[in-house]
Amino acid sequence: MKSIKRIGLCISLLILIIFVTSCDGDNKIIGDSKEEQIKKSFAKTLDIYPIKNLEDLYDKEGYRDGEFKKDDKGTWLIRSEMKIQLKGENLESRGAVLEINRNTRTAKGHYIVREVVEDSDGMTHNHTKRYPVKMENNKMIPLKPIDDEKVKKEIEEFNFFVQYGNFKELENYKEDEVSYNPEVPIYSAKYQLKNSDYNVEQLRKRYNIPTQKAPKLLLKGSGNLKGSSVGYKNIEFTFIENKEENIYFTDSIYFNPSEDK
């Protein structure tokens, strides 16, 4: 009788071990699956890069959901901005935002120059200048006369990152960290890049980046992983980030319902 009980106990323990092991395995599979979903979600967005001629977006449709009206073709919103703060200096940023309306086939936005100044009381103040622009023949054109020749030239030569960025090597990047918060939901993926990376070389070619430190690439998103017109996906190349110095480049492209509908 005792031997039968021992055999029964052993069988019960064996079943318990198998069950626990299976549960752990399931959790791991779920975790790996979510990580892959995050990577695929970003890859799908980044697959649009590059679009050398922004006017191609007039004929390109993005992700649509219930937020769009039937007769609304949607509006693309693109933004690129370089921010630099050297030790003991103010944070300066230069960039542009453009709304490409597929209904009206027009594109308008602003070239933005911003300086963040800290006063003697430690309070920060934003000094921002916005220069209205439109896009014609894949070029940004000021809508008002500009006296500042430096800014005028910057606008003439400006390209959004989506026009030259390329993420065909994304699957070969080695990630430092992938995170997901289902309650918000927000998710991100971080990669350490090399200075030989194509996108890093392109940024250095276009901007005077005062460091030789290779950046980290941070991809940040919110909303449904499968797609959402109310969510976002942002790209950030962080060269330096601390209390005294900050050098980073941000970029984003969204497809939203049009305000004129």
From Swiss-Prot:
Sorted UniProt keywords: Cell membrane, Lipoprotein, Membrane, Palmitate, Signal
Presence of the UniProt keyword Membrane in the record: yes
Signal sequence coordinates: 1-22
A Pfam family the protein falls into: DUF576
Location(s), subcellular: Cell membrane
The protein's name: Uncharacterized lipoprotein SAOUHSC_00404
Family of the protein in this entry: Belongs to the staphylococcal tandem lipoprotein family.
InterPro entries: Csa, Csa_sf
Membrane topology: Lipid-anchor
GO cellular component: plasma membrane
Predominant location: membrane
Residues with lipidation of kind N-palmitoyl cysteine: C23
Lipid linkage positions (S-diacylglycerol cysteine): C23
